[in-house]
Amino acid sequence: MDKEFDKWNKKKKHINGQSDYLPLYHERQIRWCRLGVNVGFEQDGTGEGFSRPVLIIKGLSRNVCIVVPLTTAIKNNKYFIPLGIVDGKEAAVIISQIRLIDTKRLYKQIKTLDKNIFADIQKAVRNLLS
């Protein structure tokens, strides 16, 4: 499968140039994020905007946060944590794909995750990293 690196690079330059755009965000939010086209098995964004929903795990500053991407291709293993219905589809987070992003990549908020489910995800991330 050919990836659209050149098309994404143009989009990424535009996103990077948005010096006045810094959305306010909070942990537990699920938002659309311009993840782009990535290497190998790293989770890509989809569609014209190269986007997919992400869960904000930790805010580090106004400019950067730690996220995990969502997927509708749910697998039954310790790296996929089910979330239920998100934006009209059954979804899960992929904790093995945890990453730091610039908040310029974030846009439309979808929902705020339930505190109990978020606590389960935090625990799974801690276990992954320990």
Features from the language model and the residues they span:
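Compact nucleic-acid interaction/catalytic patches
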Residues: 43-87
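C-terminal terminal-subdomain/extension
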Residues: 1-10, 15, 23, 48, ...
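Loop/turn positions that initiate beta-strands
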Residues: 27-28
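Short, charged beta-turn/beta-strand-edge "cap" motif at the junction between a beta-strand
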Residues: 36-41
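Residue-level recognition of conserved beta-strand positions in structured domain cores
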Residues: 35, 69-70, 97
